[in-house]
Amino acid sequence: MESLQVKEYMNHYPVTFTPDMVVEEAALRFLKTKQIGGPVIDKNNQLIGFLSESDVLSKMIETIYYNEHIADVADLMRKDVLTVKPYDSVIELGQQMLKNKPKVYPVVDDDENLLGTISRNDVLRAIDLHLRSGYKG
C-alpha cells in the first residue's frame, strides 16, 4: 500500500496560541478560523501545550456563572500533548485517533518545533482521496 504521510495532508497554518494570551482573545481566534483546537507555542515556536474550543467554552461559562476574571491560555492548556511527526503514516494516525480522544494533533519536528496540525477531517480526506484514486501509486 502506498505510504500516506502526515506532511502531505497537514494544515501548515494552524491557529496558534501563546501562554500569556487571555481566553477572550483565544475564543476570538477560534471563531475567526473555525478550528476546534490549536497548539500553544512559546516565542521560539516550541510546542508547550494544546488548547481546545471546549477548554475555552468551559472557562467562559464558568466566568459568567461566578463573575470571575478570565484566565490566560496557560491556565487552561493541556501540557501533555500527543503529537505526530511529518513522516508518520496517516493510516496509523487514523487508527490512533480511533483509540485516543484528540481530534487535532500538532505536527512537530524532532526538536518539538511546531510545523502544523492534522485533524480527523484531514485524515478522513487523505484516506478518501487514496480510496478514490483506485490505489494507484
Residue ranges and their predicted role:
Residues 3-8, 22, 26-27, 40-49, ...:
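Short charge-dense sequence patches
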Residues 30-33, 38-54, 97, 105-122:
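A glycine-centered beta-loop-beta connector
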Residues 1-13, 52-83, 89-98, 114, ...:
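Tandem CBS (Bateman) regulatory domains
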Residues 16, 20, 46, 66-67:
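A generic helix-loop boundary/linker signal
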Residues 17-34, 41, 83-101, 108, ...:
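The conserved cystathionine-beta-synthase
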